[in-house]
Amino acid sequence: MSCAPRSRPQEANHALRPLNVVLITIDTLRPDHLHCYGDSNIETPALDALAARGVLFESAVAQTPLTPPSHASIFTGQYPTVHHVRNTGGFVLPSSAKPLARILQDQGWDTAAFVSSAVLKKAIGFNNGFTVYDDQMPRQGNKRDFGEDAERKGGDTVDRALEWLNTQSGKPYFLWVHLYDPHMPYNPPGAFKDKYKSAPYDGEIAYTDGQVGRLLDAVSKKAPAGKNVVAVLSDHGESLSEHGEYTHGVFLYDATLRIAFMMAGPGIPSGLRVKQQVRSIDFLPTLLALLGGRAPGAIQGLNLVPAFSGQAVPTEISYEETVYPKLAMGWAELRGIRTNRWKYIRAPKPELYDLTQDPRETVNVLKQHPAEVGKLEAQLSNISGGGASESVETNTLDERQMTELKSLGYLSGFSPQHYDLNGQGSDPKDKIAILKLLYDAENSQTHLPEARRIAILEQALRQDPSNPSLYHQTGSELEKTGRYDDALRLYRSALAHGIENGRLHSRIADLSLRKGNKEEAISEYEKAAKLNPLDLESAVNLGTAYLEEGKVPEAERVFKWILSADSDNAAANNGLGLVAIQKKDPDAARNYFDRAVQLDPDLVEAQMNLGLLYEMSGDRARARHYFEEFLAKASPAQYGSIIPKVKQELATLQ
């Protein structure tokens, strides 16, 4: 087995064939739960039809079982060690990257993306090259949920994509639609819930297939098949209790790394099934080859088009990693190499599996094959950079954002977190009991009382007191039950255990603010922002706290920073409107409030602020309109003290 080079320089593209490109990525989709991959217990007619008119890769694998880094590999053709997106949260695709959307946009394509989860929000750099990047998640009551758990149903995402598609004419387009429904919790809608009552994960997949069908029907009506290249990939799979893991992210077994991968369009034979191992990094060079071009820059992926005519493509080696156990759990990270025959996993207790004899990876044969282990370890070291240790830091800001942050005078001390990926820490295999407790707490939200869920998490925390995720999840459950003081004590105890991250300081800040301790809240929000400036929800809270303390210049810098990171942030526009009022500039305030309402018609704070502004200017009709909008949408639980005052103001305007 020869050592593969880490990357291959590719020639720049000349003019590409003007074909429409439609990429659908389906989150958490195991290929062995699709009919076209052999599962007779599920109906997936849209994906079956796509496979029938194109190529299906029978042995496709992802580079990591995590959504952002896996998508980064799909779009760049690079391993995570090269594109630098290593985990969910805390990492940004560098602005210097040349992802697929940038390549096609530079060649004249219209580009649009519609994503279904906040883990792919534009602030982490995936909007590079997209003219439209729709990452708006649904509201939770009167608060838009920007947390990593925020998602929207595939039908809503496809609706938005179809609206955009209907505006396209003339130019070729690149449309990316990301569907998140197979991700836990599994709660398929309507008839799918009834039909797949005993297999809700399959129900989510069947529902998603229907949304794929809706989208592809519209694509085919917009232009004939000869004008469209369509690709479907899953970003990773789902363990479904195999190997003691219930979801994904912790281990590197095929349950979470085998993916669905199919393509159809000009230059792709119908009904072809490719058996050799291929990788998610191979998508980019393959697509560009179909368009008559080459992938630019240093990539690790290979063009699979020769495989369509039976030629071998040297995709024998696939690098795999998950740093999630280290960054989220405080355990050891895992790295591995997969070939057509072998799976080698570097861990505190390393593993080797013969996939031809043991495809479910149940018998570790490491001791029986020392020579193979040596070869695979050499391959792994070659790809991952040599030594057994690597120092990484969360790169929540790229160079453009750092420049913007400095120009605004915001956050003089950005403090990225450093991690040593040295294989040290508990082997995740030894923490299966913790994973079981976590799953029991997460998966029983409609079955167990809140107190029981908290007890389960506290049991896990006693067994693993240095696990950051356990503090976050236990604290969240305590907050849901109104045990705010207990949650605050828990978060502070996490700091005492040496755990520090932006999310932890943000939660301490929110709870301090609830107790009326504004000074501590501001201090904690500032710490959170220094660790992760792209936690925009915390940044909004920091700006609001500054305003309430009369620190108008500081508030203005924060809100402007937010808009530099996300120009469509409604809350930041509302905040700058409040700043403009403090600066006695009602015209600017009105513009900001109008923009906030335009971006988010349900942002009731902006509705109320417009009402007050129009009342002050003597425009009684508009003041009434916005006060009525506020009263129609404001939650009594959140705005109980304000609603009577707005009603009183409205009465004076009748």
Segments (PLM) and residue ranges:
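TPR/TPR-like alpha-solenoid helical repeat scaffolds
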Residues: L612, Q638-Q654
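Structural signature of tandem alpha-helical TPR/SEL1-like repeats
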Residues: Q445-I456, K480-S493, E500-R503, R514-K527, ...
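Structural marker of alpha-solenoid helical repeat scaffolds
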Residues: Q463, H497-G498, L531, A565, ...
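A hydrophobic alpha-helix/topogenic segment detector
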Residues: V540-N541, N574-L576, M608-L610, E615, ...
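Generic detector of contiguous secondary-structure segments
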Residues: V392-L405, D600-A621
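Catalytic domains that recognize anionic headgroups
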Residues: S2-D510, R514, S523, L534, ...
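Short helix/strand-capping connector loops at secondary-structure junctions
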Residues: M1, L355-P359, R624-A634
